[in-house]
């Protein structure tokens, strides 16, 4: 039986993969198929607001799911308002989070812990990955040197701030 308590954490597609024919697998896993795309996790938090007068109100607000991820819920157009700077900041933060997820794919489903900043963690990961790739022969010495130089430049710029 595919459906038991030990298999609850495994997606149904994975459980039934061997039972499907190839055509059905192709349709089911096609990212362009709107009927099988997965719903994004909405990042809405609740807060109890205490107004100056009257009872406390429970309100929803948009926020990032963690400090290292970005999934905005709202769909507002603020391009032609005084809020444009906020939108640009949000877009920059989104790019940073996407870059962080490239370095640490598990951050999309597991909250990162530790005291390092995003930049420190990414530089450290880049150095480790570059060393592994160089020692295994996947990259040349010039590429390895360039990566290390870029990491040093980033660290130097951080120290200057």
From Swiss-Prot:
The record's Gene3D superfamilies line, in alphabetical order, gives:
6.10.140.720
Identify the enzyme class.
transferase
Instruction: Show the coiled coil region(s).
Output: none
Matches recorded under Pfam families: Flu_PB1
InterPro entries tied to this protein? RNA_pol_PB1_influenza
**Reaction catalysed by this enzyme:** RNA(n) + a ribonucleoside 5'-triphosphate = RNA(n+1) + diphosphate
Q: Which UniProt keywords apply?
A: Eukaryotic host gene expression shutoff by virus, Eukaryotic host transcription shutoff by virus, Host cytoplasm, Host gene expression shutoff by virus, Host nucleus, Host-virus interaction, Inhibition of host RNA polymerase II by virus, Nucleotide-binding, Nucleotidyltransferase, Phosphoprotein, RNA-directed RNA polymerase, Transferase, Viral RNA replication, Viral transcription
**Localization per Swiss-Prot or TrEMBL:** Host nucleus; Host cytoplasm
PTM per UniProt?
Phosphorylated by host PRKCA.
Q: What is its main location?
A: host cell
According to the UniProt entry, its GO molecular function terms are:
nucleotide binding; RNA binding; RNA-directed RNA polymerase activity
Keyword set includes Nucleotidyltransferase: yes
Query: So what EC number does this one have?
Result: 2.7.7.48
GO BP, sorted A to Z: symbiont-mediated suppression of host gene expression; symbiont-mediated suppression of host mRNA transcription via inhibition of RNA polymerase II activity; viral RNA genome replication; viral transcription
| GO CC term (a single one) | host cell nucleus
Task performed by this protein? RNA-dependent RNA polymerase which is responsible for replication and transcription of virus RNA segments. The transcription of viral mRNAs occurs by a unique mechanism called cap-snatching. 5' methylated caps of cellular mRNAs are cleaved after 10-13 nucleotides by PA. In turn, these short capped RNAs are used as primers by PB1 for transcription of viral mRNAs. During virus replication, PB1 initiates RNA synthesis and copy vRNA into complementary RNA (cRNA) which in turn serves as a template for the production of more vRNAs.
Q: What's the family?
A: Belongs to the influenza viruses polymerase PB1 family.
Quote the subunit structure annotation: Influenza RNA polymerase is composed of three subunits: PB1, PB2 and PA. Interacts (via N-terminus) with PA (via C-terminus). Interacts (via C-terminus) with PB2 (via N-terminus); this interaction is essential for transcription initiation. Interacts (via C-terminus) with human PKP2 (via N-terminus); the interaction competitively inhibits the interaction between the RNA polymerase subunits PB1 and PB2.
Recorded protein name is RNA-directed RNA polymerase catalytic subunit
Q: Which organism is it from?
A: Influenza A virus (strain A/Camel/Mongolia/1982 H1N1)
The major lineage groups are: Viruses, Riboviria, Orthornavirae, Negarnaviricota, Polyploviricotina
The gene that this protein is the product of is PB1
